[in-house]
Amino acid sequence: MSFASETKKELTQIEADNHCMKAEVSALIRMNGSLSFANKQLSLDVQTENAAIARRLYTIMKKLYPYNVELLVRKKMRLKKNNVYICRVREGARELLIDLEIISDDFQFNHTISRKLIKKNGQKRAYLRGAFLAGGSVNNPETSAYHLEIYSLYKEHGEALMDLMNEFELNAKTIERKKGFVTYLKEAEKISDFLNIVGAHQAMMKFEDVRILRDMRNSVNRIVNCETANLNKTIGAALRQVENIRFIENSIGLDQLPEKLREIARLRVEYQDVTLKELGEMVSSGTVSKSGVNHRLRKIDEIADALRRGEKIGG
Protein backbone atom coordinates (compact mmCIF):
# COMPACT_ATOMS: atom_id res chain seq x y z
CA MET A 1 0.00 0.00 0.00
CA SER A 2 1.36 3.42 -0.95
CA PHE A 3 1.99 6.15 1.62
CA ALA A 4 -0.95 8.14 0.18
CA SER A 5 -3.26 5.11 0.48
CA GLU A 6 -2.14 4.47 4.07
CA THR A 7 -2.83 8.12 4.88
CA LYS A 8 -6.33 7.98 3.39
CA LYS A 9 -7.10 4.73 5.19
CA GLU A 10 -6.14 6.38 8.48
CA LEU A 11 -8.33 9.41 7.71
CA THR A 12 -11.38 7.20 7.07
CA GLN A 13 -11.16 5.91 10.66
CA ILE A 14 -11.38 9.31 12.38
CA GLU A 15 -14.41 9.97 14.55
CA ALA A 16 -16.06 13.38 14.22
CA ASP A 17 -19.12 15.30 15.39
CA ASN A 18 -22.01 16.15 13.06
CA HIS A 19 -20.71 19.63 12.19
CA CYS A 20 -17.30 18.27 11.18
CA MET A 21 -18.84 15.34 9.30
CA LYS A 22 -20.96 17.80 7.30
CA ALA A 23 -17.87 19.84 6.38
CA GLU A 24 -15.99 16.69 5.37
CA VAL A 25 -18.80 15.22 3.29
CA SER A 26 -19.41 18.57 1.57
CA ALA A 27 -15.83 18.46 0.24
CA LEU A 28 -16.24 14.86 -0.93
CA ILE A 29 -19.53 15.58 -2.71
CA ARG A 30 -18.36 18.89 -4.19
CA MET A 31 -15.21 17.30 -5.63
CA ASN A 32 -16.36 13.77 -6.54
CA GLY A 33 -20.09 14.24 -7.08
CA SER A 34 -22.01 14.29 -10.36
CA LEU A 35 -25.66 15.03 -11.14
CA SER A 36 -28.05 13.43 -13.59
CA PHE A 37 -31.77 13.62 -14.40
CA ALA A 38 -33.90 10.53 -14.94
CA ASN A 39 -37.69 10.35 -14.95
CA LYS A 40 -37.86 14.02 -13.96
CA GLN A 41 -35.85 13.25 -10.83
CA LEU A 42 -32.45 14.63 -9.85
CA SER A 43 -29.89 11.99 -8.91
CA LEU A 44 -26.58 12.57 -7.09
CA ASP A 45 -23.69 10.10 -7.55
CA VAL A 46 -20.47 10.37 -5.55
CA GLN A 47 -17.80 8.11 -7.01
CA THR A 48 -14.52 6.75 -5.62
CA GLU A 49 -12.21 3.78 -6.23
CA ASN A 50 -11.40 3.57 -2.51
CA ALA A 51 -13.68 1.19 -0.59
CA ALA A 52 -12.88 2.75 2.80
CA ILE A 53 -13.77 6.24 1.53
CA ALA A 54 -17.02 4.90 0.03
CA ARG A 55 -17.97 3.26 3.35
CA ARG A 56 -17.21 6.45 5.27
CA LEU A 57 -19.19 8.61 2.85
CA TYR A 58 -22.15 6.21 2.95
CA THR A 59 -22.10 6.10 6.78
CA ILE A 60 -21.91 9.89 7.16
CA MET A 61 -24.66 10.58 4.62
CA LYS A 62 -26.95 8.03 6.32
CA LYS A 63 -26.25 9.62 9.70
CA LEU A 64 -26.73 13.25 8.64
CA TYR A 65 -29.69 12.97 6.25
CA PRO A 66 -33.02 11.11 6.24
CA TYR A 67 -32.75 10.29 2.54
CA ASN A 68 -32.19 6.85 1.07
CA VAL A 69 -28.52 6.33 0.16
CA GLU A 70 -27.51 3.47 -2.14
CA LEU A 71 -23.99 2.04 -2.22
CA LEU A 72 -23.23 0.55 -5.65
CA VAL A 73 -20.16 -1.35 -6.85
CA ARG A 74 -19.14 -1.32 -10.50
CA LYS A 75 -16.26 -3.05 -12.26
CA LYS A 76 -13.92 -0.71 -14.11
CA MET A 77 -13.01 -2.49 -17.35
CA ARG A 78 -10.53 -0.10 -18.92
CA LEU A 79 -6.90 0.24 -17.79
CA LYS A 80 -6.78 -0.59 -14.06
CA LYS A 81 -9.58 -3.01 -13.28
CA ASN A 82 -10.37 -1.54 -9.87
CA ASN A 83 -13.86 -1.50 -8.44
CA VAL A 84 -15.69 1.80 -8.61
CA TYR A 85 -17.90 2.59 -5.61
CA ILE A 86 -20.87 4.93 -6.01
CA CYS A 87 -22.92 6.52 -3.24
CA ARG A 88 -26.23 7.47 -4.87
CA VAL A 89 -28.99 9.72 -3.56
CA ARG A 90 -32.14 10.15 -5.64
CA GLU A 91 -34.97 11.48 -3.53
CA GLY A 92 -33.66 14.40 -1.50
CA ALA A 93 -30.58 15.06 -3.66
CA ARG A 94 -31.57 18.68 -4.30
CA GLU A 95 -32.26 19.38 -0.61
CA LEU A 96 -28.95 17.78 0.40
CA LEU A 97 -26.98 19.89 -2.09
CA ILE A 98 -28.75 23.08 -0.97
CA ASP A 99 -28.02 22.25 2.68
CA LEU A 100 -24.32 21.89 1.84
CA GLU A 101 -24.47 25.11 -0.23
CA ILE A 102 -23.17 23.32 -3.30
CA ILE A 103 -26.18 24.65 -5.20
CA SER A 104 -28.53 27.53 -4.43
CA ASP A 105 -32.35 27.43 -4.27
CA ASP A 106 -32.51 28.51 -7.92
CA PHE A 107 -30.06 25.74 -8.89
CA GLN A 108 -26.97 27.93 -9.35
CA PHE A 109 -23.73 26.05 -8.62
CA ASN A 110 -21.40 27.43 -5.96
CA HIS A 111 -17.81 26.41 -6.77
CA THR A 112 -16.21 27.89 -3.66
CA ILE A 113 -16.33 26.69 -0.02
CA SER A 114 -19.35 27.60 2.10
CA ARG A 115 -18.16 29.67 5.07
CA LYS A 116 -21.21 28.44 6.99
CA LEU A 117 -19.74 24.94 7.01
CA ILE A 118 -16.26 25.97 8.18
CA LYS A 119 -16.98 28.43 10.98
CA LYS A 120 -14.88 26.60 13.57
CA ASN A 121 -11.35 25.27 13.48
CA GLY A 122 -12.47 21.64 13.62
CA GLN A 123 -14.77 22.16 10.64
CA LYS A 124 -11.93 23.69 8.63
CA ARG A 125 -9.75 20.67 9.40
CA ALA A 126 -12.62 18.35 8.45
CA TYR A 127 -13.14 20.10 5.10
CA LEU A 128 -9.44 19.72 4.29
CA ARG A 129 -9.67 16.07 5.30
CA GLY A 130 -12.60 15.54 2.91
CA ALA A 131 -10.81 17.40 0.13
CA PHE A 132 -7.72 15.22 0.55
CA LEU A 133 -9.83 12.06 0.55
CA ALA A 134 -11.61 13.23 -2.61
CA GLY A 135 -8.70 14.48 -4.70
CA GLY A 136 -5.50 14.40 -2.69
CA SER A 137 -2.17 12.65 -3.07
CA VAL A 138 1.14 12.76 -1.22
CA ASN A 139 4.47 11.39 -2.39
CA ASN A 140 6.22 8.61 -0.51
CA PRO A 141 8.81 10.55 1.55
CA GLU A 142 11.29 7.66 1.28
CA THR A 143 11.61 7.67 -2.50
CA SER A 144 10.48 11.01 -3.89
CA ALA A 145 10.70 14.75 -3.56
CA TYR A 146 8.35 16.12 -0.92
CA HIS A 147 5.00 16.91 -2.55
CA LEU A 148 1.35 16.97 -1.48
CA GLU A 149 -1.46 18.10 -3.75
CA ILE A 150 -5.24 18.27 -4.01
CA TYR A 151 -6.91 18.35 -7.42
CA SER A 152 -9.95 20.58 -8.05
CA LEU A 153 -12.00 20.81 -11.23
CA TYR A 154 -12.78 24.51 -10.74
CA LYS A 155 -10.41 27.43 -10.23
CA GLU A 156 -12.65 29.01 -7.56
CA HIS A 157 -12.50 25.87 -5.44
CA GLY A 158 -8.74 25.44 -5.92
CA GLU A 159 -8.14 29.00 -4.76
CA ALA A 160 -10.60 28.66 -1.85
CA LEU A 161 -8.78 25.49 -0.82
CA MET A 162 -5.46 27.34 -0.99
CA ASP A 163 -6.86 30.16 1.18
CA LEU A 164 -8.22 27.66 3.71
CA MET A 165 -4.89 25.83 3.90
CA ASN A 166 -3.09 29.13 4.35
CA GLU A 167 -5.27 29.94 7.35
CA PHE A 168 -3.05 27.27 8.95
CA GLU A 169 0.09 28.98 7.54
CA LEU A 170 0.86 26.13 5.14
CA ASN A 171 2.19 28.30 2.30
CA ALA A 172 -0.05 26.49 -0.20
CA LYS A 173 -0.06 27.47 -3.87
CA THR A 174 -2.41 26.74 -6.78
CA ILE A 175 -1.47 26.00 -10.37
CA GLU A 176 -3.54 25.22 -13.46
CA ARG A 177 -3.11 21.73 -14.87
CA LYS A 178 -4.79 19.78 -17.63
CA LYS A 179 -8.53 19.56 -16.90
CA GLY A 180 -8.35 21.36 -13.57
CA PHE A 181 -6.38 23.08 -10.83
CA VAL A 182 -3.94 21.72 -8.27
CA THR A 183 -3.41 23.15 -4.79
CA TYR A 184 -0.06 21.93 -3.53
CA LEU A 185 2.58 21.96 -0.79
CA LYS A 186 6.30 21.45 -1.46
CA GLU A 187 7.92 22.05 1.94
CA ALA A 188 8.41 18.96 4.10
CA GLU A 189 7.54 20.83 7.29
CA LYS A 190 4.26 22.12 5.81
CA ILE A 191 3.28 18.67 4.52
CA SER A 192 3.86 17.30 8.03
CA ASP A 193 1.71 20.13 9.43
CA PHE A 194 -1.08 19.35 6.94
CA LEU A 195 -1.12 15.66 7.91
CA ASN A 196 -1.41 16.71 11.55
CA ILE A 197 -4.18 19.23 10.77
CA VAL A 198 -6.39 16.70 8.98
CA GLY A 199 -5.83 14.08 11.70
CA ALA A 200 -3.42 11.67 9.98
CA HIS A 201 -1.18 11.46 13.05
CA GLN A 202 0.34 8.05 12.27
CA ALA A 203 1.15 9.16 8.72
CA MET A 204 2.65 12.36 10.11
CA MET A 205 4.90 10.38 12.50
CA LYS A 206 6.07 8.12 9.67
CA PHE A 207 6.65 11.15 7.44
CA GLU A 208 8.68 12.87 10.19
CA ASP A 209 10.77 9.74 10.85
CA VAL A 210 11.64 9.45 7.17
CA ARG A 211 12.28 13.19 6.87
CA ILE A 212 14.69 13.19 9.83
CA LEU A 213 16.58 10.18 8.43
CA ARG A 214 16.76 11.78 4.97
CA ASP A 215 17.97 15.09 6.38
CA MET A 216 20.61 13.30 8.49
CA ARG A 217 21.73 11.25 5.48
CA ASN A 218 21.95 14.38 3.34
CA SER A 219 23.94 16.19 6.05
CA VAL A 220 26.36 13.26 6.34
CA ASN A 221 26.73 13.13 2.55
CA ARG A 222 27.45 16.86 2.43
CA ILE A 223 30.09 16.51 5.15
CA VAL A 224 31.68 13.50 3.42
CA ASN A 225 31.64 15.28 0.05
CA CYS A 226 33.19 18.38 1.59
CA GLU A 227 35.89 16.36 3.37
CA THR A 228 36.55 14.36 0.20
CA ALA A 229 36.88 17.58 -1.81
CA ASN A 230 39.28 19.01 0.78
CA LEU A 231 41.27 15.77 0.83
CA ASN A 232 41.47 15.71 -2.96
CA LYS A 233 42.62 19.31 -2.92
CA THR A 234 45.30 18.51 -0.32
CA ILE A 235 46.50 15.43 -2.23
CA GLY A 236 46.55 17.39 -5.48
CA ALA A 237 48.63 20.15 -3.89
CA ALA A 238 51.08 17.63 -2.38
CA LEU A 239 51.54 15.85 -5.72
CA ARG A 240 52.17 19.17 -7.48
CA GLN A 241 54.71 20.16 -4.83
CA VAL A 242 56.57 16.83 -5.09
CA GLU A 243 56.59 17.12 -8.89
CA ASN A 244 58.07 20.63 -8.67
CA ILE A 245 60.67 19.56 -6.11
CA ARG A 246 61.80 16.66 -8.32
CA PHE A 247 61.92 18.99 -11.34
CA ILE A 248 64.22 21.34 -9.40
CA GLU A 249 66.35 18.40 -8.25
CA ASN A 250 66.78 17.15 -11.81
CA SER A 251 67.38 20.65 -13.20
CA ILE A 252 69.81 22.29 -10.77
CA GLY A 253 69.84 20.04 -7.69
CA LEU A 254 68.24 20.79 -4.32
CA ASP A 255 71.59 22.02 -2.97
CA GLN A 256 71.04 25.20 -5.01
CA LEU A 257 68.03 26.08 -2.84
CA PRO A 258 68.30 28.19 0.33
CA GLU A 259 68.62 25.97 3.43
CA LYS A 260 65.04 26.62 4.68
CA LEU A 261 63.56 25.68 1.31
CA ARG A 262 65.90 22.71 0.89
CA GLU A 263 64.85 21.12 4.18
CA ILE A 264 61.12 21.58 3.58
CA ALA A 265 61.54 20.19 0.04
CA ARG A 266 63.22 17.02 1.32
CA LEU A 267 60.60 16.60 4.06
CA ARG A 268 57.76 17.00 1.54
CA VAL A 269 59.20 14.32 -0.78
CA GLU A 270 59.76 11.93 2.13
CA TYR A 271 56.38 12.54 3.84
CA GLN A 272 53.92 13.13 1.02
CA ASP A 273 50.76 12.24 2.96
CA VAL A 274 51.20 14.48 6.01
CA THR A 275 49.52 17.85 6.53
CA LEU A 276 51.33 21.18 6.38
CA LYS A 277 51.01 21.44 10.17
CA GLU A 278 52.66 18.04 10.64
CA LEU A 279 55.35 18.97 8.11
CA GLY A 280 56.11 22.13 10.09
CA GLU A 281 56.62 20.10 13.26
CA MET A 282 59.39 18.06 11.55
CA VAL A 283 61.65 21.05 10.79
CA SER A 284 64.98 20.52 12.62
CA SER A 285 65.46 24.14 13.65
CA GLY A 286 62.09 24.27 15.43
CA THR A 287 58.41 24.11 14.60
CA VAL A 288 57.30 26.20 11.63
CA SER A 289 53.66 27.30 11.41
CA LYS A 290 51.30 25.97 8.76
CA SER A 291 51.36 29.33 6.96
CA GLY A 292 55.18 29.35 7.17
CA VAL A 293 55.40 25.90 5.55
CA ASN A 294 52.87 26.97 2.90
CA HIS A 295 54.96 30.08 2.15
CA ARG A 296 58.13 27.99 1.64
CA LEU A 297 56.35 25.51 -0.62
CA ARG A 298 54.93 28.37 -2.70
CA LYS A 299 58.47 29.70 -3.12
CA ILE A 300 59.55 26.25 -4.34
CA ASP A 301 56.64 26.28 -6.85
CA GLU A 302 57.76 29.69 -8.10
CA ILE A 303 61.35 28.47 -8.55
CA ALA A 304 60.16 25.42 -10.52
CA ASP A 305 58.00 27.65 -12.74
CA ALA A 306 60.96 29.98 -13.33
CA LEU A 307 63.19 27.05 -14.30
CA ARG A 308 60.56 25.82 -16.75
CA ARG A 309 60.63 29.27 -18.35
CA GLY A 310 64.42 28.93 -18.72
CA GLU A 311 65.32 31.53 -16.09
CA LYS A 312 68.56 31.23 -14.08
CA ILE A 313 68.25 30.62 -10.34
CA GLY A 314 70.95 31.82 -7.99
CA GLY A 315 72.13 29.75 -5.03
From Swiss-Prot:
SUPFAM superfamilies: Homing endonucleases. Pfam families: HTH_WhiA, LAGLIDADG_WhiA, WhiA_N. The keyword DNA-binding applies. One of its GO terms (biological process) is cell division. Keywords: Cell cycle, Cell division, DNA-binding. Residues 275-309 bind DNA. InterPro entries: Homing_endonucl (IPR027434), Sporu_reg_WhiA_N_dom (IPR018478), Sporulation_regulator_WhiA (IPR003802), Sporulation_regulator_WhiA_C (IPR023054), WhiA_LAGLIDADG_dom (IPR039518). GO terms for molecular function: DNA binding. The keyword Cell division applies. Involved in cell division and chromosome segregation. PANTHER family: CELL DIVISION PROTEIN WHIA-RELATED. Belongs to the WhiA family. This is Probable cell division protein WhiA. The lineage of its organism: Bacteria, Bacillati, Bacillota, Bacilli, Bacillales.
